[in-house]
């Protein structure tokens, strides 16, 4: 996988202020504020910074937590995980493997088959609709 490196100025020119805050400074959007929280269309979710494919709509579920939730990533996603002890909590941060964008966090309270909940900021992803079948 090709790594993507840009300066802070380049990211600021490419992203809107909320996308930059969330993805480049490890911010968190307010619960229930993101455009994909209740989104149910068929397709894929990719990194808003570099278009790396991350999640399929078939793994999205309604968790009630206020952020888009997935029980698994695409087989090819290779999402990076690292410990996060900010804000007095112990969590696992999720990062795009191609550009190191902050995506959200992973928790062990999700549904089968994984038992995991990928809690993702809407500002860190964009949706690509599944093409209509002929």
Name these PLM-found stretches:
Residues 2-134:
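A short Gly-Trp-Pro
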